[in-house]
């Protein structure tokens, strides 16, 4: 369970909301309304102006940041490392090295494993970053505009992965300007 209590940020929003396990929520709103900031606060990267964020009844300021996997505008890839090295790096942080090959297989990355990430197109870099969702075992996914610039096939793979995460008890929060294609998703408007 993820709970936001009187969460405020620069007069952009004031939230009291709880996200239950097995939920998918799209965060919608105009540009500059605080969607990315909200996700960064939940990830523990930014601090709110006031209020508290609890994950499994613990204040996120008091727990290790491994409770979530956050993918934002900065994809978190090491450009000089190969695709395989990047996935292995992240999976080892989360103590889930065995999941690297599942990520490679799911996104069909076999032919790219030895390529340096800087040599990939921006769309393929994003897929490698998204593959971290499989390689890093966390129950809370925070995805900031990850659907942007994905091919139709890769967007379908991502949506399927999101639904599988929710079906296994995970919580997924996404910001997106695109129309939600996941019918079971809730919409949170913060504009």
Swiss-Prot record:
GO terms for cellular component: plasma membrane. The keyword Transport applies. This is Cytochrome c biogenesis ATP-binding export protein CcmA. It is an enzyme of class 7 (translocase). ATP binds at residues 29-36. It is a peripheral membrane protein. Part of the ABC transporter complex CcmAB involved in the biogenesis of c-type cytochromes; once thought to export heme, this seems not to be the case, but its exact role is uncertain. Responsible for energy coupling to the transport system. Residues 2-190 form the ABC transporter domain. Its EC number is 7.6.2.5. GO terms for biological process: cytochrome complex assembly. It comes from Rickettsia conorii (strain ATCC VR-613 / Malish 7). SUPFAM superfamilies: P-loop containing nucleoside triphosphate hydrolases.
